[in-house]
Amino acid sequence: MRGDAFSRCHPVVCFTFFFGAIACSAVYQHPAYLIASLLCAALYDLLLRGRRAGRRMLLALPLFLLLCILNPIFNPAGEHVLFVWLGRNFTLESLTYGVVIGGIFVSMLFWFDCYNRVLTSDKFTTLFGNLIPSLSLLLVMVLRLIPELTRRTAQLRGARRCIGKGADRGDTLRVRLSDGVAVLSALTDRALEDSVVTGDSMRARGYGTARRSSFQIYRMTGRDGLLLALELLLLTAAVLFGASDAEYFPTLTLARPNWAFALYCAYLLLPSALHIKEAVQWHILRSKL
């Protein structure tokens, strides 16, 4: 089995799902909705990337803990005081809100990781290349910038270690800072050179002189139409009828989730369900050979 079932859907289907999932993850502050978004994003990221996604999740854990701790330090609001340290109140409401903010940030990181894996630059160009060509190109370049810089940073560090100039964990802070500055300098030079080469290549190929075209032609099938309708139905019902109200200050007040919460979970699980369904079918077919 090659690829992912949801990745092979029409770009409109993929973009609609990620737009709804990321927007809801950023807006909803109810713990139940946040946990659902975080778990569904982590599940789909694991299905797409496997062990690499697991390593990224471990790296995201310190960031989550940092955001959880920072909010109670700078925001002493709330009625239920847990303890007092250095004259500042650390409240249950402030700590809970810090956990929520950290969860929102991490869940959006996972969703954007899945987005970069599923919605490639060619799919994004297919959707918006003819409507907003300059903006679509800018967004594509920005979305691929972080993964590209991360990959190049790893290459530069590996190359420096091979020639004996890299910093190890046991080195002093000065040595590690010097190594980091050298890597950053080389990374900046490489990025500037690539931007010049990209600009020259685009001018040589006649960028902006004619209507944009796509490398691959995507056609909306009946399956894509049904999936898109299901996405819109689940998302609309979850937004209109969901009980997602949450207040953290001055006291913690949470709405009790109703039946629409199940629709929200079903919406977030659509890509994972398609992936698992296809994987099961593939293994069944292989077992019959």
Model-found features: residue ranges?
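N-terminal transmembrane hairpin
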Residues: 1-126, 209-289
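Structured inter-helical modules in multipass membrane proteins
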Residues: 108-219
